[in-house]
């Protein structure tokens, strides 16, 4: 395994092989039936590639990577938007053993510098310009701050650097990757500091996307819309773009997740499956009330990244059609899905149950003892697609993993008697108001259900007498008629919320800051209020 990575213990790895969770399946080289060669594989703003064309493009870029001097084991930071180059380059990396480190669209020079330095990356791959940001200038800053970069590869006009399109050469014979070698690096959520690198092997990631596609009934007739950035684990492999391509289906990459962009794509491409984070769902529901686009092809709408409040969840099928599937997981591994045939009550009120029968999950109290069903505790997990350690992070690993290899998620959950999980929040995401602990996610759900807002976040602000007071930050449904603090307090009291949980302060915003993976960035929110 790659230096700096933590392997599974050999007895555990052997068991995963023997039980069939890990096999010879490697990313990017999947068998196809003859009819799939001419079927659409990838649809982007630049056009459509068939499965055969995508395969050839990946082979040519793989040869181009090798001709440019990159080799198996080299790390490259991939910072591309939802365009064909992202997927072609990913497949080329999987075939050559070059290891992509997936940066997120919102990242800029500080984050890219951190990723390059941590991975000792030899290349940075970026677009020329997106939404007014010139990423060639970002590259210049990163080059000035790091020592390992040898290549800057630009999709579009390269300026002083190298055009990504120049990585084009006649295909060459390539040795098959070892399924248990690292294939790619994902990023942690970054809610507690700079993102950490998550090594994923061919074997574990192939199992994840293969099993996710089976559970979601994704096959060659399906069309998956990557509304979210395809570097996200959610949009990439749950089953996402890679799971859909492996199944012989079609992946459509949206340049933005907004309804005005995605609804026409759903109609035009006949999209059957897509994925959203909770802040986007109310916006799609509002847009669905007036859209003239035909959304009837949509079979499954996955929602994950944070808990979806039940009131909003109930509206999804009524407004958008298809089946809502709640997904609770982490780039580190464990995935939980509601099943497509679950009762409505399970789909609305829970975030699903584990993907694999080999997922080992504990819910523990503060003292480390196992919680009872219905009792809140921290989720700990290990399994055939859950990492055993972050990349080059021994100090972090010492606190985030138990001695027997369970990953400490930091998530507070409840497990029902039927085995489904309900996400309560994060261990450190509580407000200590005069000694009373205010669970912020609970209050946020009350706000979304009882107040006319499309987004809500509750944070603690310092107070000389109480230690902290609660502040509700909201985005109003109608900007011309924002709620007042009195409105909010009355609405929550009307729902029977305890007095200490009712917000002390209200801040109305145009939008909430989000992390790269679509979660509310409460650190940025606090900094915004302090400014």
Task: Name every feature range the model reports, one short phrase each.
Residues 354-358, 367-400, 438:
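Conserved ATP/PPi-binding loop(s) of AMP-dependent carboxylate-activating enzymes
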Residues 107-114, 124-126, 274, 383, ...:
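AMP-binding/adenylate-forming catalytic core of the ANL superfamily
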Residues 347, 362-380, 417-418, 479-486, ...:
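Conserved beta-loop-beta connector loops within the AMP-binding
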Residues 206-223, 233-273, 287:
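Conserved AMP-binding/adenylation subdomain of ANL enzymes
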Residues 271-275, 287-346, 360:
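Gly/Ser/Thr-rich phosphate-binding loop
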Residues 67-68, 98-164:
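Structural core segment of the AMP-binding/adenylate-forming
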Residues 21-23, 38-83, 87-91, 108-113, ...:
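Conserved AMP-binding/adenylate-forming core of the ANL superfamily
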Residues 38, 169-189, 194, 199-203, ...:
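Conserved pre-ATP/AMP-binding loop-to-beta segment of ANL
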């Amino acid at each position: 395994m790659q230096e700096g990575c933590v392997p599974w213990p050999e007895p555990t790895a052997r068991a995963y092989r023997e039980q069939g969770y890990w096999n010879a399946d490697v990313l990017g080289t999947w068998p196809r039936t003859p009819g799939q060669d001419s079927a659409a594989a990838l649809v982007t703003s630049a056009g459509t590639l068939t499965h055969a064309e995508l395969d050839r493009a990946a082979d040519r870029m793989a040869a181009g990577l090798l001709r440019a001097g990159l080799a198996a084991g080299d790390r490259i930071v991939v910072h591309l938007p939802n365009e064909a180059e992202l997927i072609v380059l990913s497949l080329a990396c999987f075939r050559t053993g070059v290891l992509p480190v997936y940066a997120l669209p919102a990242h800029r020079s500080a984050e890219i510098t951190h990723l390059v330095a941590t991975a000792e990356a030899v290349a940075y791959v970026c677009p020329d310009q997106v939404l007014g940001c010139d990423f060639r200038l970002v590259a210049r800053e990163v080059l000035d701050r790091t020592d390992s970069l040898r290549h800057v590869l630009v999709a579009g006009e390269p300026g002083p650097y190298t055009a990504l399109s120049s990585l084009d050469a006649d295909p060459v014979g390539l040795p098959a990757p070892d399924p248990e070698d690292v294939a790619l690096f994902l990023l942690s959520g970054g809610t507690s500091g700079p993102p950490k690198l998550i090594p994923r092997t061919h074997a574990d990631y192939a199992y994840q996307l293969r099993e996710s596609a089976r559970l979601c009934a994704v096959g060659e007739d399906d069309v998956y819309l990557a509304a979210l950035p395809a570097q996200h684990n959610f949009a990439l492999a749950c089953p996402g773009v890679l799971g859909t391509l492996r199944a012989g289906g079609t992946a459509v990459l949206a340049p933005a997740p907004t309804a005005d962009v995605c609804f026409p794509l759903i109609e035009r491409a006949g999209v059957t499956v897509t994925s959203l984070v909770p802040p986007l769902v109310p916006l799609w529901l509002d847009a669905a009330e007036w859209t003239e686009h035909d959304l009837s092809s949509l079979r499954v709408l996955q929602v994950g990244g944070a808990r979806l409040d039940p009131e909003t969840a109930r509206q999804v099928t009524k407004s958008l059609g298809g089946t809502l599937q709640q997904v609770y997981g982490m780039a580190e591994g464990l995935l939980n899905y509601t099943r497509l045939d679950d009762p409505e009550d399970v789909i609305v009120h829970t975030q699903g149950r584990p993907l694999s029968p080999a997922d080992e999950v504990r819910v523990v109290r503060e003292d480390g003892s196992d919680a009872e069903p219905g009792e809140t505790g921290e989720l700990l997990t290990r399994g055939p697609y859950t990492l055993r350690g972050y990349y080059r992070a021994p100090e972090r690993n010492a606190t985030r993993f138990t001695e027997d290899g369970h990953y400490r998620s930091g998530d507070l959950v409840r497990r029902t008697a039927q085995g489904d999980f309900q996400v309560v929040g994060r261990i450190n995401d509580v407000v200590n108001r005069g000694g009373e602990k205010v669970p912020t996610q609970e209050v946020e759900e009350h706000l979304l259900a009882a107040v006319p807002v499309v987004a809500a976040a509750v944070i603690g602000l310092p107070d000389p007498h109480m230690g902290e007071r609660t502040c509700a930050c909201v985005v109003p449904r109608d900007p011309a008629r924002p709620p007042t603090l009195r409105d909010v307090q009355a609405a929550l009291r009307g729902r029977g919320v305890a007095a200490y949980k009712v917000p002390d302060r209200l801040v109305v915003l145009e939008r909430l800051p989000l992390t790269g993976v679509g979660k509310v960035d409460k650190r940025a929110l606090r900094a915004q209020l302090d400014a």
